[in-house]
Every structure is written in C-alpha cells, then in structure tokens.
Amino acid sequence: MIATNSIKAWFLAARPKTLSAAAVPVLIAIALAMRDCYLMETVGDAAQPRILRIPTLLCLLFAWVMQIDSNFVNDYFDFKRGNDDETRLGPKRACAEGWITEHAMKTGIIVTTLLGCAIGLPLVIYGGIAMIWVGVACVAFCFLYTTTFSYHGMGDILVLLFFGIVPVCCTYYVIMPEGYKTVNAEVMMAAIACGLVVDTLLVVNNFRDRDNDREAGKRTLIVKLIDRWGEKSALRLYLLLGYVPLAIMMGMEIHDAVVRDTSTFALPLYAVYAVMHHTTYRQMKTINHGRELNRVLGSTARNIFIYGQIVFLTIVLGFALEI
C-alpha cells in the first residue's frame, strides 16, 4: 500500500528508470568535449584546455530535473484526459492510482519547472543569452509533448531534438572553455545518433499502446506506419533506430583514427550494443501485444544506457590510448 503524497509515491511518479535516457546525451557531450580538449594543439607554454566542471554538473542536473518535470506533466495530463484507465497497458501512474492528488501533482510540476529554470539559468554565464531560449524550449517541450505533439505524430521528432540535438550540442558548447565554443559536424552527428537511439524507447511505448492510441485518436508515428504498411514496418523502424546510430558512431571513430590517429581499440564494444538491441527486437517481435511489452520497454531503457556508456568509453579510450 502506497500512502497518498508520500515520499515513495513521489519517487515512483518521478520514474527513476527514465533518468538514464536523460543522462545519455550529456554523457556523450562530455566525452566529445574531453576528446576535443585533449587533442587540441597548444602554443608555447599554454595550458591544455579542459572542460568546465560547473556547467557540466549543471547540464546533468538540468537534464534530470526536466525529465522528472516531463514525467509529472505526462502523469497529470494523461490522467485528466482519461488515458490512464483500466485499459492502460503501461506501468501504473501516480495520479490514476491515487498515489498523488491532482493538487499535489500540479504543485510538483510548478516546483520542478522552477527548479529546472534555477539550475539552467547560470548556464547563461557559459553559453550566452541563447541558453535562455534553449531553456524556454525545453520547458515548452515538457508541456507540449504530452498535451499536443504526441497526438499528431510529432513525438519522435521532439525526441530527436530534445534527447539528441539540443542536449548534446548545447552541453558540448557550454562545457568547452572560452575560445573553443563551437559545435562541429561530429558533435551534430553524435547528437543525431543519440536522439535516434533514445527514440527506440518511444517506439516500443507506442507499439504497445497502438490499439488504445488509435481508439483515442492519438495518431502517433507507429499508428500511422501500421495503418499504412502493417506491423512489420514498426518493427523495422525499431531495428533501424538502433543500427543507424551504430553506423554513424563507428564511422566517426574510424574517421578519427585516420585523420587524428586516435585508437580504435575500443571499437568492438559497439558489438555489445548491437547484440543487445537485436535480442530486444526479437523479443518485441515475439511478444507483439499486451502488457508483456513492458519487459521490452525495460530492456530498451537498459540498452540506451549501455549505448551511452559504450559511446563514452570508445571516445575517451580513443584519445587516451593515443596519448
């Protein structure tokens, strides 16, 4: 029995398992910034550039708080729309189960939104006034994803943007030292790859909920694909969203080895993610329907976190072994 508005209730409402997906883009940006700092040529006795620690910590905290904020918003508005009824296939939600009252959840949304803004505001010091607009966009994403865009097949684009391009590129930019603040093509490619990998989580979620979403008038990308080309198209999308980022990152690593003479010693680590992703795909294909797909959701979340760790290790070991 979970007491209403208890610490345990808030812990479950925060959905701690989703925090790994929020951390992965920041982790990848840190690895890229570390590599670029270490491989920069210095003039004379100039000190080797180092990534900035304070904005690094702020970016990670901001990502986690905004993820929790998004979870609270999703919990509240799905409950208000009546989406979390007895037909729901996904994990239990706090408002629907009565763990947290509507008033308390609205307060929680306000608190996490303000906390996220407070954490993100100092990043203006390191990234300029543009960081304010980035923060506004992130807050808008938290609300518009659940209330509007997810109903019109835009969820996957938003995931690519706000779990890939925005967090990777912005984190990289603000943690680089003065005089080196720029976003190169490699950072952008890594950001796109990250967004695609994280989108596998949304694909599984929407594949599980496809029938309920269709009845509710929620036209997700998965619903549109299945209605036009059948269920195999959704399964193939899941497979591609895992494999395309591997091709991107392995291509980058090989390019660096040729151009920058970095090590490819850790490159085989990508095979670990490839095997895990394919295994999860087969599991998804076999289960196909119902609440059992929640197991696939858990496996996919694990795969995303493993992907982030592998990318971090391959990038860091690439320049560390070269040095």
Locate the predicted segments by residue.
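Membrane-embedded alpha-helical segments that form the functional core of polytopic membrane enzymes
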Residues: 26-28, 44-73, 132-143, 182-204
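Topogenic membrane-insertion module of multi-pass membrane proteins
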Residues: 1-54, 58, 62, 152, ...
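Small-residue-rich segments of transmembrane alpha-helices in multi-pass membrane proteins
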Residues: 23-29, 158-172, 194, 223-224, ...
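Acidic (Asp/Glu-rich) catalytic motifs at the cytosolic membrane interface
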Residues: 65-89, 200-222
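Multi-pass membrane catalytic core of lipid/isoprenoid biosynthesis enzymes
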Residues: 86-126, 218-262, 301-302
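Functional transmembrane core segments of multi-pass inner-membrane proteins
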Residues: 160-210, 214-216, 232-235
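Intramembrane alpha-helical segments
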Residues: 92-179
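Extended hydrophobic alpha-helices typical of membrane-associated regions
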Residues: 254-323
